[in-house]
Amino acid sequence: MGFWKFPPFLVLSILVLYQAGMFHAAPFRSVFDGRFDPATLDEEESRLLLAAMVNDYEQMRARESEKAQKTEGSRIQKRACNTATCMTHRLAGWLSRSGSMVRSNLLPTKMGFKIFSGPRKNFWF
């Protein structure tokens, strides 16, 4: 008996789902609103279409270059700061780059405890 109740329920649920799907589907297009065919354009329409495409492309490139300039400007602005923190970081960077020159010119080559084990030399005149 349960078998006879199942097919009408199945048919009814399929119809409900079909109707619900129709409400969300794209609107019906008429036969005359076919796909766009560029071969049917006359010369003036093709020129207008080409001009619109070129204009759109130029606007897109202008937006991209404007966005790139904004990001580049913020990067330059960050590098050109003159606050005490920035100057301290610049000085630290300069000292770390010139550290090898300072070591070779000002510090003795022998370092460690053996440097003081030999006879004392008087550096004062």
Swiss-Prot record:
| Database matches in Gene3D superfamilies | 6.10.250.2190
UniProt keyword Disulfide bond present: yes
Q: Does the keyword tRNA-binding apply?
A: no
Which segments of the protein form a coiled coil according to its record? none
Query: In the UniProt record, which is one GO cellular component term?
Result: extracellular space
Domain of life of the organism encoding this protein: Eukaryota
Q: Where in the cell is it found?
A: Secreted
Q: Which family does it belong to?
A: Belongs to the calcitonin family.
Task: Explain the purpose of this protein.
Answer: Stimulates cAMP production in porcine kidney cell line LLC-PK1 via the calcitonin receptor (CT) but not via the CT-like (CL) receptor.
Name under which the protein is recorded:
Calcitonin receptor-stimulating peptide 1
| Primary gene name | CRSP1
